[in-house]
């Protein structure tokens, strides 16, 4: 019987699975697609994401995690079990030891929900680690030293800000402003500035490719296709990195304020 040690970053937008000795073996969206008529799960992760917009209206997408915590326990449990089995494979193995990252501001009840979901998904042992600690270790910082390290971990649903020293968290805060809010800000900006309706995936592409929190020395451009809110017809707009900086300014400033406080 083969024992496995697994690390899971249970994010609002995506899930990463790490296996000791192999590294990150899986990164997929935290999305579950299910049939609204039968209430049965049709796909999980990347397969679920690919189904969106290409399937009948009875297929809907669910994000079982919201702002870093479980919003749908049953679906989260099934999603975790699916990803663990996919990462480990079909071979016979002892129940794995699992470490799961959670935002620094989660309550005991929320933490217990994550722990229970991991056990129900097949864990032998479960360890809960605060995301800033995991981020610091992953960045190669020696957190055992007697000096302060500030960590800012911007996820999909939450941003964690912490000062870490001597192996522990000195002070921390978790705000529910993060990557999803950047996407929504871009969607709002495109609607207001260009009368163009775009989806979350298109907004995320814009953010990743030319998104900026400050003015760049060189302006970058990207063509975006959506629906004209005036005519209802498809329309393509050329968007600049200067525009994304403007779109993200308010959301970025909220994270900066949290860091300063």
Where are these regions (language model features)?
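Nucleotide/phosphate-binding catalytic cleft detector across ATP-hydrolyzing
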Residues: 1-154, 162-261
């Amino acid at each position: 019987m083969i024992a496995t040690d697994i690390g899971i970053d249970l994010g609002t937008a995506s899930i990463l699975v790490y296996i000791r000795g192999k590294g990150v073996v899986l990164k997929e969206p935290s999305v579950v697609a299910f049939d609204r008529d039968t209430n049965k799960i049709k796909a999980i992760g990347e397969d679920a994401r690919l189904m969106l917009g290409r399937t009948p209206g009875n297929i809907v997408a669910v994000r079982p995690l919201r702002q870093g915590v479980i919003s749908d326990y049953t679906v989260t449990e099934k999603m975790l079990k699916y990803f663990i089995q996919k990462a480990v494979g079909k071979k016979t193995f002892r129940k794995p030891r699992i470490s799961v990252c959670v935002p620094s501001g989660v309550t005991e009840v929320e933490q217990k929900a994550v722990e229970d979901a991991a056990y129900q998904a097949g864990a032998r042992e479960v360890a809960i680690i605060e995301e800033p600690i995991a981020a610091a270790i992953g960045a190669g910082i020696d957190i055992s030293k007697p000096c302060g390290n500030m960590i800012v971990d911007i996820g999909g649903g939450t941003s964690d800000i912490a000062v870490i020293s001597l192996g522990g968290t000195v002070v921390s805060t978790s705000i529910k402003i993060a990557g999803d809010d950047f996407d929504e800000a871009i969607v709002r900006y495109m609607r207001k500035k260009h009368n163009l309706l775009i989806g979350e995936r298109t907004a995320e592409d814009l953010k990743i490719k030319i998104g900026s929190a400050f003015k760049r020395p060189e302006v970058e451009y990207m063509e975006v296709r959506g629906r004209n809110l005036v005519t209802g017809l498809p329309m393509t707009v050329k968007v600049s990195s200067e525009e994304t900086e403007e779109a993200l300014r308010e959301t970025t400033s909220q994270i900066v304020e949290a860091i300063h406080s």
